[in-house]
Amino acid sequence: MELSSVQLLADHLLNEHELFKKGWRFSFDRAKRRAGCCRYSKKEITLAKAYAEQEELKEIKNTILHEIAHALVGPKHGHNVI
């Protein structure tokens, strides 16, 4: 997928979940072993650039939403049930 399209999608989803208001941002990183990351201390959600370039829209959106869920519940939750 085009990185500019992924950026627009991520920005839209962050805005939709009111994370932009809280200072959260989206960017790409160079990760090789994971798709996405939620960094609470930086208020930043990232996707691996290589992942974003090769995956389809549905998978990318799902990954961004997964990281947004982490941002919304906070650092103490990890992958447990809320």
Question: What are the functions of these language-model segments?
Answer:
Residues E67:
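Walker B catalytic acidic pair
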Residues M1-N62, A71-I82:
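Active-site-proximal or metal-binding-adjacent scaffold patches in catalytic folds
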